[in-house]
């Protein structure tokens, strides 16, 4: 687990050739997910929006950068939580 206020990254998915990346931002601790009404790790993304741990693969920014390991990166928008 990383400390609140630390840099973090979040991936939607990955395979052998491609990483679908929500982006990088700040880990802000546990927050209430607006739809599932459960507290979950929350990352405020630099590009705007938030992503919750239950919606992605996440970790420290360095860990995520290292895990990309030369694969193509496709930036994807944060999850749409509109009804």
Where in the sequence are the language-model features?
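Intrinsically disordered, low-complexity, charged/polar segments
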Residues: 40-83
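Residues that form ligand- and interface-recognition hot spots within folded domains
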Residues: 12, 31, 47
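Hydrophobic beta-strand residues in large extracellular and virion-surface proteins
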Residues: 8, 25-27, 43
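Short beta-strand-centered aromatic/proline hotspots
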Residues: 17-32
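Glycine-rich, flexible loop segments associated with nucleotide phosphate handling
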Residues: 21-24, 37-42
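A short, compositionally biased
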Residues: 3-5, 35-40
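Short coil-to-beta transition motif at edge beta-strands of beta-rich domains
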Residues: 1-20
């Amino acid at each position: 687990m990383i400390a609140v206020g630390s840099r973090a990254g979040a991936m939607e998915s990955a395979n052998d050739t491609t990483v679908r990346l929500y982006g990088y931002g700040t880990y802000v601790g546990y927050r209430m997910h607006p739809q599932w009404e459960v507290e979950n790790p929350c990352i405020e993304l630099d590009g705007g929006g938030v992503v919750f741990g239950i919606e992605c693969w996440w970790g420290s920014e360095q860990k995520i950068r290292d895990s990309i390991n030369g694969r193509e990166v496709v930036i994807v928008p944060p999850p749409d939580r509109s009804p």
